[in-house]
C-alpha cells in the first residue's frame, strides 16, 4: 500500500513546464500545451487579471 507522503515526492522528476515561445517564462505546460504565465496556446490575447496590479494604478 503506497501512500502519497514524503517518499513519493522523490518520484516527481518529470519535466512539466518548459520555456514559453511568447513570454519566455518557464511556464509552458507540455501536456496541456498552455502557458500558465501569458496564456499562450489557449488564447490570442495575453493572460492578465485586475488583481495582478494595485487598485487605482493605471
From Swiss-Prot:
Binds 1 zinc ion per subunit. A zinc finger (C4-type) spans 20-38. One of its GO terms (biological process) is translation. Signal peptide: none annotated. Zn(2+) binds at residues 20, 23, 35, 38. Belongs to the eukaryotic ribosomal protein eL37 family. This is Large ribosomal subunit protein eL37. It comes from Halorubrum lacusprofundi (strain ATCC 49239 / DSM 5036 / JCM 8891 / ACAM 34). The gene is rpl37e.
